[in-house]
Amino acid sequence: MAPVYEGMASHVQVFSPHTLQSSAFCSVKKLKVEPSSNWDMTGYGSHSKVYSQSKNIPPSQPASTTVSTSLPIPNPSLPYEQTIIFPGSTGHIVVTSASSTSVTGQVLGGPHNLMRRSTVSLLDTYQKCGLKRKSEEIENTSSVQIIEEHPPMIQNNASGATVATATTSTATSKNSGSNSEGDYQLVQHEVLCSMTNTYEVLEFLGRGTFGQVVKCWKRGTNEIVAIKILKNHPSYARQGQIEVSILARLSTESADDYNFVRAYECFQHKNHTCLVFEMLEQNLYDFLKQNKFSPLPLKYIRPVLQQVATALMKLKSLGLIHADLKPENIMLVDPSRQPYRVKVIDFGSASHVSKAVCSTYLQSRYYRAPEIILGLPFCEAIDMWSLGCVIAELFLGWPLYPGASEYDQIRYISQTQGLPAEYLLSAGTKTTRFFNRDTDSPYPLWRLKTPDDHEAETGIKSKEARKYIFNCLDDMAQVNMTTDLEGSDMLVEKADRREFIDLLKKMLTIDADKRVTPIETLNHPFVTMTHLLDFPHSAHVKSCFQNMEICKRRVNMYDTVNQSKTPFITHVAPSTSTNLTMTFNNQLTTVHNQAPTTSSATLSLANPEVSILNYQSALYQPSAASMAAVAPRSMPLQTGTAQICARPDPFQQALIVCPPGFQGLQASPSKHAGYSVRMENAVPIVTQAPGAQPLQIQPGLLAQQAWPGGAQQILLPPAWQQLTGVATHTSVQHAAVIPETMAGTQQLADWRNTHAHGSHYNPIMQQPALLTGHVTLPAAQPLNVGVAHVMRQQPTSTTSSRKSKQHQSSVRNVSTCEVTSSQAISSPQRSKRVKENTPPRCAMVHSSPACSTSVTCGWGDVASSTTRERQRQTIVIPDTPSPTVSVITISSDTDEEEEQKHAPTSTVSKQRKNVISCVTVHDSPYSDSSSNTSPYSVQQRTGHNGTNTLDTKGGLENHCTGNPRTIIVPPLKTQASEVLVECDSLGPAISASHHSSSFKSKSSSTVTSTSGHSSGSSSGAIAYRQQRPGPHFQQQQPLNLSQAQQHMAADRTGSHRRQQAYITPTMAQAPYTFPHNSPSHGTVHPHLAAAAHLPTQPHLYTYTAPTALGSTGTVAHLVASQGSARHTVQHTAYPASIVHQVPVSMGPRVLPSPTIHPSQYPAQFAHQTYISASPASTVYTGYPLSPAKVNQYPYI
């Protein structure tokens, strides 16, 4: 689609060209004139404002423009029909699209200067051409200026470069191609030259207060950019400098992560400052207009809100005010390929908060904050008001407060939300324009002037432009209620509306000091969708999760693609004869234009065709976007995506090993019966000194036998961590267990911060026979391989010191397994950009078939409360098209407050005790419908808070309310710093939930996990969690399950926290308990509360390990599915240097049915079955689970 300009008060006359022109376009432009236009493009005043001349037209129906970013191949053989705009009779111009596949495509104009007195925003690629809502008065002094045809002019100085200055005087502008207003006289196909690039003007996009925007082709490439040519009028020169400085500051941040437009460079052309931006597709206003101003569903408003709030959060952290946030300045990046992916544009009105001046004219009127209208001091909160107005407009399809004047604006606000507070009105410098004080009263109060009074004073007639008039904002929840929702979906919609209105009221708080902040907005339930946890079976909820998929962190291709680009360069321009080119160092090139070459040797998959969709598979979680992520520059990141196309992977084996940073390798379509394996980057197992060799991947590791087909999955050893090239990356992205040789010689914090992690890892990957052992599996049985980690106890003379410190251990689980259902040829992307010292916070279920993008997405929630009482739940939501149930449990506690109190003083106490890591989930066969009920009741566990609780200096809060879904008991973490023993329950209705996290010196408490009752089957599960926002929320970042990260306290003195890898069955099933009765674990406190056995519910399977595990290892328990008559297990053979010798006992207590007693079946597993191992840290034991229904390939 190409621009559609409506409302031009002119007609078109077409002239044949004098000469043939060579350009980026190879087709001609045809213009169609349609009469009876309702919109007028004429008129520009001191603020370049335009209103409709027609009295009967609503004042907020401007025209829309849409532009294609496709670029035809240059063809000099085709002539151009030159287009010149003349003033004339009323009509509007419809410019058909410029097509890259047909010579009938259109090009706007020829080598003529083209100027249009349209009034559009600064950087809007598409601007409405009727109403300019930032305007104040109407001046119809001129419509269109005609420029004589002339060839492109390039003025050269002595050095041969284009004359470039930052600021010019009025005298200079008179002879530099500018008119009296300072606008540059644009010429079609003119070449704009920076010091490094040349840009050919293709077409005019719009005009704003500070200049105009043109669509340009970057010569020598296939890139289309938008160039904003600022006016060189003295009144705009200063603001232009401010905009350049702000863009230069933003260029140091990730434009994709923080959702603002990417600026490429700044240069001077004929004394005009030119800003080069990425080309975006369509603004939200035109999107609304294209949809006939129909209301936008909340499930689409949510991702837009989240992305813009993320941008405002970054601006607030930088002390910047956007000051012109409106639908026209929120651009859809690529609606067809990335639905509702938006970016904030137009920083022409932006300023630093320290330079904010009262009574400054800021913001478009519809979105103007009360403090601006009243002349109060203001800050970044004005942007939050604007965002509230924007989302209200998306919800209503019409502006909430469409005031034709500032009086109408404050009148609308006061009628709906009440008068501003007395102290605000009294302090406002412009209050008396709109309010009168009742002097007769002993307590004089402000009252709003009547429309007649205001008109009598100012001569401005009050108008009523509202489509909806609300007595209060709560009434908005009743409008535009959808009628196509039934049952639970309608309940979901109502709950969603309640949260939306709640957030909207906080955003539209008249008092700016009480207005919600961007961080609080991102943590609001409407954004985090915690209020939807009660409807896990709803298809509407699933759709909400899928729509939020766009909010995930994006791969920063700049680190690998643009290293050869010009760095940030600023040439000071003291005079008009000095060149100035400023190259912004922020993602100089879009990822789809340049990508690393495909290289199977480095596991790099570059696919320029689909790389624009290359997102992180880490789940978005609020306030995580504040993390500045740094990708390892030594390893190329893949840019392909399985959702678009499946390409053969570089390895044609049945087993694919995906190291961190290279996750998401697609399985070959010819290997449907094989394994698509994802390496869980959970815990580096360090058993040697820091001088260990970095990880090397040998081809022998990937040469596997053809395993039986079926929906099978495997979790590879988490110790396979590093590639050689990663050693140069300084930001640590893995949690590491302290090696024994290092624990006694070096402080943890120093080792954590000063060394690259690449050299600390055990080179166990160099053993060719690592996976050569063949695992015999039934073809119909899926395989789950669990990994449990434990640190071996180091015998020292300071055991008593460890005992005294044991109560300070913090139970922490910072990693979970990801069990997803996906076709073998559809592997989700798993690339991730990582920042040092940022804790993993969330997880994601990504389930999609081949050539589709069906993603279930969830994210953590950082609660606004600062208490230690936190809640977590396992969310089970349906995920299409696969009905397979996936359960993910997230547990990530941050104990920064306690960790900051003390630095580690004992190197011995950094070792962990023998602890068993368990995960319990329910598992049951699924069906193809979304109404399969999980009949397991919730178990309440109370009264155990004093049984095994230790005396901690900080105390424990043992009260938590809610329904338990899943509880994970992670291993103990012993450190010298004072940390509470905390174990947050995933269900809020567990009284004394912290009993499961209390440990004696040599005892480990076991917790029973109960499966919460859900009213429907689920194929995706996300664990939401609420955390208190500590003072270091900037260190939070979405967790990519295949690349978990390590958390550190802000003072960099806290101990390491090891991440645990868990595997969960793909079917919902009954809870299981894992009590460990062994001398090394001391007294067991299982706190079991058996659930009522329903006819379809299996018995609680109990696995016992009667033999002492000693100090040598741990075991991962996976249970057989219900209804299975035989419970067989095959142990994978691993080399002795990998696994411990761990007894695995599965006695007759493992029953296939709750009605079958142990006497009916003999013991199917021999007691004291040993797996050949050595004292490393992990055990790999696979147990068959429920039969596979479909040929799915879960990824871990």
From Swiss-Prot:
Location of region: Disordered: 50-69, 792-847, 891-963, 991-1058
Start-end of Low complexity biased regions: 923-937, 991-1046
Protein family membership: Belongs to the protein kinase superfamily. CMGC Ser/Thr protein kinase family. HIPK subfamily.
Region feature Interaction with POU4F1, mapped onto this chain: 752-897
Gene that produces this protein: Hipk2
Lineage: Eukaryota, Metazoa, Chordata, Craniata, Vertebrata
Recorded phenotype for the gene knockout or disruption: Inhibited terminal erythroid cell proliferation and terminal enucleation, as well as reduced accumulation of hemoglobin. Impaired transcription of many genes involved in cell proliferation and apoptosis, and of erythroid-specific genes involved in hemoglobin biosynthesis, such as HBA and SLC25A37/MFRN. Enhanced stability of CTNNB1; accumulation of beta-catenin leading to the potentiation of beta-catenin-mediated cell proliferation and tumor formation. Small eyes with deficient lens, abnormal retinal lamination, and thickened retinas.
Residue numbers of Phosphoserine PTMs: S16, S118, S135, S441, S634, S668, S815, S827, S934, S991, S993, S1042, S1153, S1186
Protein's name according to its UniProt entry: Homeodomain-interacting protein kinase 2
Organism of this sequence: Mus musculus (Mouse)
Post-translational modification: Sumoylated. When conjugated it is directed to nuclear speckles. Desumoylated by SENP1. Sumoylation on Lys-32 is promoted by the E3 SUMO-protein ligase CBX4.
Enzyme class, first EC level, given as a word: transferase
